[in-house]
Amino acid sequence: MYICSVTCKNTKMKRIERHNYLQKLIAFKDKKLIKVITGIRRCGKSTIMEIYRDWLVAHGVMQEQIIYLNFEDYDYFELRDPRKLYSYVKPLIQQDKMTYIFFDEIQHVTDFPDIINSLNLKPTVDLYVTG
């Protein structure tokens, strides 16, 4: 069983165990499907993605194989433009091993279906989105 904890506001808090959700993501790992995590606002979609990213690293995936962007973060505001997002992500895609791409709150990206469909065509991309 995989249980994580996260440090928040200088106190150690345990995350709610999401074993079933984690197992579902693991079952679809490296499959050419776009994995979409849905739910009401503040229900833990981003946390599930974080737990899964931690699981990937714990199971041998290197950090440089993981791309995570949260489009609610103003640091990534420019990447809401589809051409800029594609130009940013494409050079980060590994050619000889799988690249795991996580887009959090993808709905903020203009024409996001075009971007995720295009990225999903790449043979070494495993794509996960919330929004």
Locate the predicted segments by residue.
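Phosphate-binding site recognition
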Residues: 1-131
